[in-house]
């Protein structure tokens, strides 16, 4: 039986008199991608913080595998525009990082050419790849991605999702991903959890897409996007949006 890296059992989180999460149960397993969907204010980021151990649940239990290595890509990175910070220096700010590990991590996400570039000059897609490379430095068993394609154009989104799937296969890690991108993300997702303070519905994308609570939340168009897009591609996209056929070289989009 596949081991479980993280188990949440009937988790609730309350801030003052306001209940943000109510009765949440889920499991994260190696090699599986779980995507959290939900409207703004649904509690997605709070749930991520619980999984990361940044905030304790008000009730319920959280069990993590001892010594679990987690890589985290935050929703936003705010940097002082006047701060001289290259990608290399930014990577070294992570505790315990060896200089020799930085270039291989960037190479893994097709961003080695950014090593000496200022962080503030990166595009949205380049920035997310650097954050992902930084998250890989501790060889994570669990990757937590909070809106990884925010501020990234469509080609960049496709490239990032292809990369996430590739890393999942190479590392065998679990992936917990928060996303609003119904049409794009579902092709790579094993399980969808639809959240609005509580779990409205969960399961495989094709199952969730027909659930009445999902349709009430995202509408019929959301249901169509979730159900229709789940198919195999014969290509992937590189950092610059170029199409790379799986059994050949590359060509322009």
Curated annotation (Swiss-Prot):
E.C. code: 7.2.2.20
Q: Where does ATP bind?
A: 38-45
Positions the record marks as coiled coil are none
Record-level Gene Ontology MF annotations: ABC-type zinc transporter activity; ATP binding; ATP hydrolysis activity; ATPase-coupled transmembrane transporter activity
Please list the disulfide bridges.
none
**Which of UniProt's keywords are assigned here?**
ATP-binding, Cell inner membrane, Cell membrane, Ion transport, Membrane, Nucleotide-binding, Translocase, Transport, Zinc, Zinc transport
Question: Where does the UniProt entry say this protein principally localizes?
Answer: membrane
**Record InterPro entries:** AAA+_ATPase, ABC_transporter-like_ATP-bd, Metal_Ion_Import_ABC, P-loop_NTPase
* Pfam families named in the record: ABC_tran (PF00005)
Q: Key word Methyltransferase present in the record?
A: no
Among SMART domains, the record links this protein to: AAA
Q: Could you state one GO cellular component term attached to this entry?
A: ATP-binding cassette (ABC) transporter complex
UniProt topology in membrane:
Peripheral membrane protein
| Tree of life domain | Bacteria
Q: Quote the subcellular location field of this record.
A: Cell inner membrane
Provide the ABC transporter domain boundaries: 6-227
**What reaction gets catalysed by this protein?**
Zn(2+)(out) + ATP(in) + H2O(in) = Zn(2+)(in) + ADP(in) + phosphate(in) + H(+)(in)
Question: Could you mention a single GO BP entry for this protein?
Answer: response to zinc ion
Reported function: Part of the ABC transporter complex ZnuABC involved in zinc import. Responsible for energy coupling to the transport system.
- Subunit comment for this entry? The complex is composed of two ATP-binding proteins (ZnuC), two transmembrane proteins (ZnuB) and a solute-binding protein (ZnuA).
Give the family from UniProt.
Belongs to the ABC transporter superfamily. Zinc importer (TC 3.A.1.15.5) family.
| Protein name as annotated | Zinc import ATP-binding protein ZnuC
Which species?
Yersinia pestis
Q: Which gene encodes it?
A: znuC
